[in-house]
Regions:
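Short beta-strand His + acidic residue motifs that chelate non-heme Fe in jelly-roll/DSBH
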Residues: 82-84, 102-103, 124-125, 129-135
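Short acidic-glycine-tyrosine-enriched beta hairpin
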Residues: 106-127
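Double-stranded beta-helix
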Residues: 33-35, 111-114, 131-154
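A short, N-terminal "cap"/entry segment at the start of jelly-roll beta-barrel domains
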Residues: 21-70, 114
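N-terminal post-signal-peptidase region of extra-cytosolic proteins
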Residues: 56-60, 72-80, 84
Length: 154
């Protein structure tokens, strides 16, 4: 009876310990209690060459190329189109300004796309083929778990 109880307690502690993940914990330096990125101090850069032209990126937290939590912002020109693609992990998007449209499927069309405006939030499921359009100059914020990848559909 004691062995069964001990095993149950150990199993409960193991499961509880596994359910707690440090993925959302920020790596603060000693004595630092907040990470802030004021809008006027964001470091905007051209998007990587594997992404379509017409976008800039600012990394707010983490590294989207490495394992772990990250948050980035994208500035998109009004004619920006992200062709059909997938991501290996869920993609969490907040539209900060402008207008975005998302269509699903390898042949998704702009006419069949769902529209999102400033203040809207959506999550695209991992593995779902989708195309993204900016209807006007836009800024979006993406939070996810890296490494973040976009696999384009030929």
């Amino acid at each position: 009876m004691k062995r069964v109880l001990l095993l149950q307690v150990m199993l409960m502690l193991f499961v509880t310990g596994c359910a707690q993940s440090p993925i959302g914990e920020f790596d603060f330096a000693d004595g630092v209690v907040q990470h802030a990125v004021p809008a006027d101090e964001m470091s905007w850069k051209a998007c990587p060459p594997n992404l379509p032209s017409g976008c800039e990126i600012a990394v707010l937290e983490g590294d989207p190329r490495a394992p772990g939590l990250f948050t980035v912002r994208f500035r998109l020109s009004e004619d920006f189109v992200m062709p059909p693609h997938t991501h290996p992990r869920d993609e969490r998007v907040t539209v900060l300004q402008g207008q975005m449209a998302v269509a699903f499927g390898a042949n998704g069309t702009r006419d069949g796309a769902k529209e999102f405006g400033a203040g809207d939030y959506y999550v695209n499921a991992r593995g779902a083929i989708h195309t993204v359009w900016a209807s006007k100059s836009s800024e979006i914020q993406i939070t996810g778990v890296g490494p973040w990848e976009a696999h384009f559909i030929d």
